[in-house]
């Protein structure tokens, strides 16, 4: 898994969005919760949301997310320098407008592949899935792999009422964590193909 972090002066390193080392689980209740989470993703056609991202070093950023399942996601970071993350079924494109450059990575090497797949499987082959119940009706589903493609930990955090995704967290193999908390979520609104278009920079 790859992580996007803000340095000073502001600069986003590649590709992340997202947290938490979990311990303990309840196998029976956990299986039910995982199925409920998979059903939640299956029922999402489109989503728009604001987000706040916090990195391990305490740096923060805000922006907007547009998702059209399956496969399509755009994450736009506010502030300077501008940064956009845009997915296709195969690629994660990192658009840096200030440098007039797009860099592309296989989506399978990022945690985004797990939540953009059709269907979503939160117990994929080769991964360990652990469920943890937290205070206030919060449920965390951690999907972990020690090595190889997609190594690291993705944690999805759901509220109980309504049951929906509120935060995701990524921890890479070096232990660097990034969390993204969603706000002002809206579902089922039109999302056109143009929202996921890539710029045509010279010499690309």
Where do the protein language model's features map onto the residues?
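N-terminal secretory signal peptides that target proteins for export/translocation
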Residues: 1-9
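Sec-dependent signal peptide recognition
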Residues: 11-18
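N-terminal signal peptide c-region/cleavage motif recognized by signal peptidases
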Residues: 24-26
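Boundary at the C-terminal end of the N-terminal hydrophobic targeting segment
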Residues: 28-31
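A short, Trp-centered hydrophobic/proline-enriched beta-strand micro-motif
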Residues: 39-58
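Short hydrophobic/aromatic-rich beta-strand segments that constitute the beta-sheet cores
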Residues: 51, 73-77, 92-95, 143, ...
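An acidic-aromatic
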Residues: 62-114, 178-179
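Gly/Pro-enriched, hydrophobic low-complexity segments
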Residues: 123-204
